Protein backbone atom coordinates (compact mmCIF):
# COMPACT_ATOMS: atom_id res chain seq x y z
CA UNK A 1 0.00 0.00 0.00
CA UNK A 2 1.62 3.25 -1.15
CA UNK A 3 1.22 6.56 0.65
CA UNK A 4 2.08 9.83 -1.02
CA UNK A 5 1.67 13.55 -0.45
CA UNK A 6 1.40 16.16 -3.18
CA UNK A 7 0.96 19.93 -2.89
CA UNK A 8 -0.08 22.68 -5.28
CA UNK A 9 -0.29 26.45 -5.15
CA UNK A 10 1.83 29.58 -5.21
CA UNK A 11 3.01 31.82 -2.39
CA UNK A 12 0.76 34.76 -3.28
CA UNK A 13 -1.86 32.84 -5.26
CA UNK A 14 -5.42 32.14 -4.07
CA UNK A 15 -4.31 29.33 -1.78
CA UNK A 16 -2.49 26.06 -1.26
CA UNK A 17 -3.71 22.52 -1.76
CA UNK A 18 -2.48 19.29 -0.22
CA UNK A 19 -3.59 15.78 -1.16
CA UNK A 20 -2.61 12.75 0.92
CA UNK A 21 -3.34 9.39 -0.64
CA UNK A 22 -2.94 6.01 1.03
CA UNK A 23 -4.14 6.40 4.62
CA UNK A 24 -6.43 3.60 5.82
CA UNK A 25 -10.13 4.07 6.47
CA UNK A 26 -11.44 4.56 9.99
CA UNK A 27 -8.63 6.75 11.30
CA UNK A 28 -9.93 9.49 13.60
CA UNK A 29 -8.84 13.00 12.56
CA UNK A 30 -9.54 16.19 14.50
CA UNK A 31 -9.22 19.76 13.19
CA UNK A 32 -6.38 20.41 15.66
CA UNK A 33 -4.39 17.55 14.12
CA UNK A 34 -3.91 19.84 11.12
CA UNK A 35 -4.23 23.35 12.49
CA UNK A 36 -1.98 23.04 15.55
CA UNK A 37 1.14 22.30 13.54
CA UNK A 38 0.32 24.94 10.94
CA UNK A 39 0.23 27.48 13.77
CA UNK A 40 3.53 26.15 15.10
CA UNK A 41 5.08 26.57 11.65
CA UNK A 42 4.39 30.30 11.90
CA UNK A 43 6.28 30.65 15.19
CA UNK A 44 9.87 31.66 15.71
CA UNK A 45 11.91 34.80 16.36
CA UNK A 46 13.03 36.22 13.03
CA UNK A 47 9.84 35.78 11.02
CA UNK A 48 8.74 38.59 8.71
CA UNK A 49 5.57 40.58 8.04
CA UNK A 50 3.81 37.79 6.15
CA UNK A 51 3.13 35.95 9.40
CA UNK A 52 1.11 38.94 10.62
CA UNK A 53 -1.20 38.49 7.64
CA UNK A 54 -1.64 34.73 7.40
CA UNK A 55 -3.52 32.71 10.00
CA UNK A 56 -3.35 29.30 8.43
CA UNK A 57 -6.28 26.94 8.91
CA UNK A 58 -7.10 23.77 7.00
CA UNK A 59 -10.34 23.18 5.13
CA UNK A 60 -10.79 19.51 4.32
CA UNK A 61 -12.64 19.09 1.02
CA UNK A 62 -12.47 15.33 0.56
CA UNK A 63 -11.54 12.02 2.15
CA UNK A 64 -13.05 12.63 5.62
CA UNK A 65 -16.57 12.16 6.92
CA UNK A 66 -17.62 12.91 10.48
CA UNK A 67 -14.01 13.00 11.62
CA UNK A 68 -12.86 9.69 10.15
CA UNK A 69 -10.90 8.82 7.04
CA UNK A 70 -12.71 7.03 4.22
CA UNK A 71 -9.68 5.36 2.66
CA UNK A 72 -9.87 7.73 -0.31
CA UNK A 73 -7.47 10.63 -1.02
CA UNK A 74 -7.75 13.42 1.55
CA UNK A 75 -7.76 16.93 0.08
CA UNK A 76 -6.94 20.04 2.12
CA UNK A 77 -7.25 23.70 1.14
CA UNK A 78 -5.38 26.55 2.85
CA UNK A 79 -6.35 30.09 1.88
CA UNK A 80 -3.68 32.73 1.28
CA UNK A 81 -5.06 35.84 2.94
CA UNK A 82 -2.37 37.94 1.30
CA UNK A 83 -3.90 37.09 -2.10
CA UNK A 84 -6.17 40.11 -1.70
CA UNK A 85 -3.07 42.27 -2.13
CA UNK A 86 -1.92 40.28 -5.16
CA UNK A 87 -5.19 39.54 -6.93
CA UNK A 88 -4.24 41.17 -10.25
CA UNK A 89 -0.59 40.11 -10.24
CA UNK A 90 -1.32 36.48 -9.32
CA UNK A 91 -4.67 35.88 -11.01
CA UNK A 92 -4.93 32.44 -12.66
CA UNK A 93 -6.51 34.16 -15.67
CA UNK A 94 -5.24 36.75 -18.16
CA UNK A 95 -4.92 40.21 -16.60
CA UNK A 96 -6.81 43.19 -17.98
CA UNK A 97 -3.68 45.34 -17.73
CA UNK A 98 -0.01 44.60 -18.29
CA UNK A 99 1.68 43.16 -15.20
CA UNK A 100 5.26 44.28 -14.61
CA UNK A 101 7.68 41.37 -14.83
CA UNK A 102 10.47 40.57 -12.38
CA UNK A 103 13.87 40.22 -14.03
CA UNK A 104 16.26 40.21 -11.05
CA UNK A 105 17.11 36.66 -9.86
CA UNK A 106 18.39 36.16 -6.32
CA UNK A 107 21.65 34.26 -5.81
CA UNK A 108 20.93 31.03 -3.96
CA UNK A 109 17.28 30.89 -5.03
CA UNK A 110 15.52 28.90 -7.76
CA UNK A 111 14.95 32.13 -9.72
CA UNK A 112 17.62 32.01 -12.44
CA UNK A 113 17.81 28.28 -13.09
CA UNK A 114 14.02 28.03 -13.03
CA UNK A 115 13.60 30.68 -15.72
CA UNK A 116 16.19 28.90 -17.85
CA UNK A 117 14.66 25.45 -17.38
CA UNK A 118 11.01 26.44 -17.91
CA UNK A 119 11.64 29.14 -20.56
CA UNK A 120 10.19 31.99 -18.50
CA UNK A 121 10.91 35.70 -18.86
CA UNK A 122 9.30 36.57 -15.50
CA UNK A 123 11.11 35.37 -12.38
CA UNK A 124 7.82 35.48 -10.47
CA UNK A 125 6.65 32.43 -12.39
CA UNK A 126 9.41 30.52 -10.59
CA UNK A 127 9.79 32.17 -7.19
CA UNK A 128 6.11 31.87 -6.27
CA UNK A 129 6.16 28.08 -6.32
CA UNK A 130 9.73 27.80 -5.01
CA UNK A 131 8.79 29.82 -1.92
CA UNK A 132 8.74 28.12 1.48
CA UNK A 133 5.11 29.20 1.77
CA UNK A 134 4.45 25.83 0.13
CA UNK A 135 5.46 24.10 3.36
CA UNK A 136 2.20 25.16 5.01
CA UNK A 137 0.52 22.54 2.83
CA UNK A 138 3.16 19.94 3.68
CA UNK A 139 2.64 20.57 7.39
CA UNK A 140 -1.11 20.08 6.98
CA UNK A 141 -0.54 16.76 5.22
CA UNK A 142 2.06 15.84 7.79
CA UNK A 143 -0.57 16.39 10.47
CA UNK A 144 -2.63 13.59 8.95
CA UNK A 145 0.40 11.31 8.97
CA UNK A 146 1.19 12.24 12.57
CA UNK A 147 -2.35 11.27 13.58
CA UNK A 148 -1.85 7.90 11.89
CA UNK A 149 1.50 7.40 13.63
CA UNK A 150 0.07 8.35 17.03
CA UNK A 151 -2.52 5.60 16.62
CA UNK A 152 0.43 3.23 16.21
CA UNK A 153 2.20 4.55 19.30
CA UNK A 154 4.70 6.74 17.44
CA UNK A 155 5.39 10.39 18.29
CA UNK A 156 7.50 12.95 16.37
CA UNK A 157 9.19 16.07 17.78
CA UNK A 158 11.80 18.65 16.81
CA UNK A 159 14.07 21.27 18.32
CA UNK A 160 16.69 23.77 17.16
CA UNK A 161 20.36 23.02 17.81
CA UNK A 162 22.02 25.98 16.12
CA UNK A 163 21.28 29.40 14.66
CA UNK A 164 24.17 31.10 12.87
CA UNK A 165 27.22 30.92 15.17
CA UNK A 166 25.24 30.03 18.32
CA UNK A 167 25.04 26.31 19.04
CA UNK A 168 23.24 24.69 21.94
CA UNK A 169 25.25 22.17 23.97
CA UNK A 170 24.60 18.54 23.14
CA UNK A 171 22.15 16.97 25.63
CA UNK A 172 23.86 15.11 28.45
CA UNK A 173 21.44 12.20 28.09
CA UNK A 174 19.12 10.79 25.47
CA UNK A 175 16.01 12.91 25.06
CA UNK A 176 12.57 11.54 25.92
CA UNK A 177 9.18 12.67 24.55
CA UNK A 178 8.43 14.65 27.71
CA UNK A 179 11.58 16.73 27.17
CA UNK A 180 9.89 18.39 24.19
CA UNK A 181 6.83 19.57 26.13
CA UNK A 182 8.14 23.12 26.52
CA UNK A 183 10.11 23.53 23.30
CA UNK A 184 7.54 25.83 21.65
CA UNK A 185 7.75 28.23 24.59
CA UNK A 186 11.25 29.15 23.41
CA UNK A 187 11.15 31.93 20.78
CA UNK A 188 13.59 29.87 18.71
CA UNK A 189 12.33 26.40 19.73
CA UNK A 190 15.61 25.57 21.49
CA UNK A 191 15.63 23.33 24.57
CA UNK A 192 18.58 25.12 26.20
CA UNK A 193 17.52 28.41 27.81
CA UNK A 194 20.92 30.07 27.68
CA UNK A 195 21.47 29.13 24.05
CA UNK A 196 17.93 30.26 23.24
CA UNK A 197 18.64 33.75 24.56
CA UNK A 198 21.92 33.91 22.65
CA UNK A 199 20.15 32.85 19.45
CA UNK A 200 17.60 35.64 19.82
CA UNK A 201 20.41 38.16 20.25
CA UNK A 202 22.18 36.76 17.18
CA UNK A 203 19.04 37.09 15.07
CA UNK A 204 18.47 40.67 16.21
CA UNK A 205 22.08 41.66 15.58
CA UNK A 206 22.29 40.19 12.09
CA UNK A 207 18.83 41.42 11.14
CA UNK A 208 19.97 44.97 11.95
CA UNK A 209 22.91 44.32 9.62
CA UNK A 210 20.45 43.33 6.84
CA UNK A 211 21.54 39.70 7.02
CA UNK A 212 19.67 36.39 7.06
CA UNK A 213 20.58 33.39 9.22
CA UNK A 214 20.70 29.63 8.85
CA UNK A 215 21.11 26.87 11.39
CA UNK A 216 20.49 23.25 12.34
CA UNK A 217 17.32 21.52 13.55
CA UNK A 218 16.81 17.99 14.82
CA UNK A 219 13.78 15.70 14.48
CA UNK A 220 13.24 12.69 16.73
CA UNK A 221 10.62 9.95 16.48
CA UNK A 222 9.79 7.57 19.33
CA UNK A 223 7.99 4.22 19.42
CA UNK A 224 9.13 2.85 16.05
CA UNK A 225 9.19 -0.90 15.57
CA UNK A 226 12.38 -2.43 14.19
CA UNK A 227 12.29 -3.24 10.49
CA UNK A 228 10.69 -0.26 8.76
CA UNK A 229 12.51 0.25 5.47
CA UNK A 230 14.75 -2.39 3.92
CA UNK A 231 18.33 -3.32 3.10
CA UNK A 232 17.52 -5.18 -0.12
CA UNK A 233 17.34 -2.27 -2.56
CA UNK A 234 18.77 1.24 -2.49
CA UNK A 235 15.44 2.99 -2.93
CA UNK A 236 13.93 1.12 0.01
CA UNK A 237 16.57 2.26 2.51
CA UNK A 238 14.80 4.47 5.01
CA UNK A 239 17.78 6.75 5.61
CA UNK A 240 17.79 7.59 1.89
CA UNK A 241 14.08 8.38 1.93
CA UNK A 242 14.49 10.55 5.02
CA UNK A 243 17.43 12.38 3.46
CA UNK A 244 15.33 13.19 0.41
CA UNK A 245 12.43 14.37 2.57
CA UNK A 246 14.52 16.64 4.79
CA UNK A 247 16.64 18.02 1.95
CA UNK A 248 13.47 18.81 -0.02
CA UNK A 249 12.66 21.52 2.53
CA UNK A 250 13.49 24.92 1.08
CA UNK A 251 17.00 26.15 2.05
CA UNK A 252 18.05 22.84 3.64
CA UNK A 253 21.50 21.86 2.35
CA UNK A 254 22.62 19.11 4.71
CA UNK A 255 21.34 15.97 6.44
CA UNK A 256 22.62 13.64 9.15
CA UNK A 257 21.38 10.52 10.94
CA UNK A 258 22.33 10.12 14.57
CA UNK A 259 25.94 11.02 15.31
CA UNK A 260 26.92 10.67 11.64
CA UNK A 261 29.59 13.36 11.33
CA UNK A 262 30.96 12.81 14.82
CA UNK A 263 31.48 9.06 14.41
CA UNK A 264 33.15 9.61 11.03
CA UNK A 265 36.23 10.62 13.03
CA UNK A 266 36.12 7.78 15.57
CA UNK A 267 37.46 4.24 15.46
CA UNK A 268 34.88 1.55 14.78
CA UNK A 269 34.88 0.35 18.37
CA UNK A 270 33.52 3.76 19.40
CA UNK A 271 31.10 4.22 16.51
CA UNK A 272 28.52 1.46 16.83
CA UNK A 273 25.79 0.51 19.29
CA UNK A 274 26.48 -2.76 21.10
CA UNK A 275 23.61 -5.24 21.39
CA UNK A 276 22.41 -6.76 24.68
CA UNK A 277 19.66 -9.06 25.88
CA UNK A 278 17.95 -9.69 29.20
CA UNK A 279 14.73 -11.55 29.87
CA UNK A 280 13.27 -8.38 31.40
CA UNK A 281 14.15 -5.96 28.58
CA UNK A 282 14.53 -8.26 25.61
CA UNK A 283 17.00 -7.11 22.93
CA UNK A 284 18.27 -3.59 23.54
CA UNK A 285 21.13 -1.13 23.05
CA UNK A 286 22.67 1.17 25.65
CA UNK A 287 23.63 3.81 23.06
CA UNK A 288 22.02 5.23 19.92
CA UNK A 289 24.89 6.56 17.83
CA UNK A 290 23.20 5.18 14.71
CA UNK A 291 20.19 7.42 15.27
CA UNK A 292 17.73 4.53 15.14
CA UNK A 293 18.71 3.29 11.67
CA UNK A 294 20.89 0.32 10.77
CA UNK A 295 21.15 -1.13 7.26
CA UNK A 296 18.46 1.20 5.96
CA UNK A 297 15.96 0.01 8.57
CA UNK A 298 14.66 1.22 11.92
CA UNK A 299 16.31 -0.68 14.77
CA UNK A 300 13.81 0.06 17.56
CA UNK A 301 15.74 2.98 19.03
CA UNK A 302 14.46 6.55 18.67
CA UNK A 303 14.97 7.92 15.17
CA UNK A 304 17.22 11.00 15.18
CA UNK A 305 17.86 13.08 12.05
CA UNK A 306 19.19 16.59 11.52
CA UNK A 307 18.82 19.18 8.80
CA UNK A 308 21.27 22.00 8.10
CA UNK A 309 19.66 25.13 6.71
CA UNK A 310 21.50 27.84 4.80
CA UNK A 311 20.74 31.54 5.36
CA UNK A 312 17.72 32.63 3.32
CA UNK A 313 18.55 33.94 -0.14
CA UNK A 314 16.26 36.98 0.01
CA UNK A 315 18.24 39.81 1.62
CA UNK A 316 17.16 43.31 2.56
CA UNK A 317 20.59 44.38 1.28
CA UNK A 318 20.60 42.46 -2.02
CA UNK A 319 23.59 40.69 -3.53
CA UNK A 320 24.90 41.35 -7.01
CA UNK A 321 22.98 39.75 -9.86
CA UNK A 322 21.92 40.52 -13.43
CA UNK A 323 18.80 41.67 -15.22
CA UNK A 324 17.80 38.60 -17.25
CA UNK A 325 16.09 40.80 -19.85
CA UNK A 326 19.16 42.96 -20.58
CA UNK A 327 21.97 40.83 -19.05
CA UNK A 328 23.25 44.01 -17.43
CA UNK A 329 24.55 44.02 -13.83
CA UNK A 330 21.86 44.67 -11.22
CA UNK A 331 20.98 44.11 -7.59
CA UNK A 332 18.93 41.02 -6.84
CA UNK A 333 15.20 41.27 -6.18
CA UNK A 334 14.05 42.86 -2.94
CA UNK A 335 11.11 40.87 -1.60
CA UNK A 336 9.42 40.76 1.78
CA UNK A 337 11.23 38.09 3.74
CA UNK A 338 12.05 36.49 7.06
CA UNK A 339 15.43 36.82 8.73
CA UNK A 340 15.48 33.32 10.18
CA UNK A 341 13.17 30.34 9.68
CA UNK A 342 15.15 27.56 11.35
CA UNK A 343 12.51 27.14 14.13
CA UNK A 344 9.79 26.77 11.50
CA UNK A 345 11.94 24.39 9.47
CA UNK A 346 11.98 22.04 12.45
CA UNK A 347 8.18 21.86 12.36
CA UNK A 348 8.29 21.21 8.61
CA UNK A 349 10.92 18.56 9.32
CA UNK A 350 8.50 16.84 11.70
CA UNK A 351 5.91 16.75 8.93
CA UNK A 352 8.31 15.31 6.37
CA UNK A 353 9.61 12.65 8.76
CA UNK A 354 6.00 11.76 9.60
CA UNK A 355 5.18 11.34 5.90
CA UNK A 356 8.16 9.04 5.34
CA UNK A 357 7.42 6.96 8.44
CA UNK A 358 3.71 6.70 7.67
CA UNK A 359 4.58 5.53 4.15
CA UNK A 360 6.99 2.95 5.60
CA UNK A 361 4.27 1.56 7.88
CA UNK A 362 1.86 1.37 4.96
CA UNK A 363 4.39 -0.46 2.77
CA UNK A 364 5.17 -3.00 5.48
CA UNK A 365 1.78 -3.61 7.06
CA UNK A 366 -0.84 -2.65 4.43
CA UNK A 367 -4.46 -2.79 5.58
CA UNK A 368 -7.61 -1.10 4.27
CA UNK A 369 -8.90 -0.11 7.72
CA UNK A 370 -6.95 1.18 10.70
CA UNK A 371 -7.95 -1.94 12.64
CA UNK A 372 -6.25 -4.09 9.97
CA UNK A 373 -3.06 -2.07 10.40
CA UNK A 374 -3.13 -2.35 14.19
CA UNK A 375 -3.63 -6.12 14.01
CA UNK A 376 -0.75 -6.51 11.55
CA UNK A 377 1.59 -4.40 13.67
CA UNK A 378 0.64 -6.28 16.84
CA UNK A 379 1.28 -9.64 15.15
CA UNK A 380 4.69 -8.45 13.94
CA UNK A 381 5.66 -7.14 17.37
CA UNK A 382 4.70 -10.49 18.88
CA UNK A 383 6.72 -12.41 16.26
CA UNK A 384 9.92 -10.46 16.90
CA UNK A 385 9.21 -10.24 20.65
CA UNK A 386 9.69 -6.49 20.59
CA UNK A 387 9.03 -4.51 23.75
CA UNK A 388 8.40 -0.79 23.71
Question: Can you say where each PLM-predicted feature lies in the sequence?
Answer:
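Generic N-terminal targeting/processing segments that precede catalytic cores or assembly contacts
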Residues: 1-388
Amino acid sequence: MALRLITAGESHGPGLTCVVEGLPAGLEIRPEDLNADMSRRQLGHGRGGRMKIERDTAEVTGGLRHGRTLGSPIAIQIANRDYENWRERMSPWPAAERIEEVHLPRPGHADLVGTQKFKQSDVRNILERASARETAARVAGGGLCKAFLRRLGVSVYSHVLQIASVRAPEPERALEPEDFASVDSSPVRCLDEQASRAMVREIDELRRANESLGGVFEVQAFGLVPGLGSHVSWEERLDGRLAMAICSIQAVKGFAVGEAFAIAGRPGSEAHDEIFYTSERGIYRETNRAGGLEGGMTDGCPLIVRGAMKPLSTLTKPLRSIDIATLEPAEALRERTDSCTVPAAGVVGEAMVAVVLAAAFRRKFGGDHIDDVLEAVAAYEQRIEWRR
